[in-house]
């Protein structure tokens, strides 16, 4: 069994450009991982199954963790599946990359479980197909993110920076 930590992220800066033909917006953002996190366990299985142990998250195909596992097995052409558990602490709809970080954790965990069948570059390409924030969440830390979020330039982390994050009672899908 493998345990992965899925850290929330915040946007320290964010510029949003025009909507692209693929439905995404061009962005230029500085993203930073924070200590708030979800916990994911992965265990090899014959099928892809997700159990939510704590918190609120979509199940089945609506969950980015399931999509990440499906994408990993499709690209690697490996037989099998994974039993996933989720302890959800990152609030849904808060813009903190909860679903994206969970998907990234699944990609990292599957890569470890199956002895790294994809290069880092290929893993990031799979991540970009799942969602715009997923490549950053695979890497974590601090990065300038451009394109739709898939073009990463490492930045210096702001360790120890005290932050107060308030979440109003609004949900942003």
What are these regions (language model features)?
Residues 2-79:
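N-terminal beta-alpha supersecondary unit
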Residues 2-5, 11-15, 19-29, 116-173:
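ATP-dependent small-molecule kinase catalytic core of the GHMP/sugar-kinase superfamily
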Residues 13, 43, 51-53, 83-87, ...:
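Solvent-exposed beta-strand sheet faces enriched in polar/charged residues
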Residues 28, 82-95:
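Short pre-catalytic strand/loop immediately N-terminal to key active-site residues, enriched for Gly-Thr
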Residues 65, 94-120, 136-138:
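DPxDG-like acidic metal-binding loop motif
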Residues 73-85, 109-130:
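Phosphate-handling active-site elements
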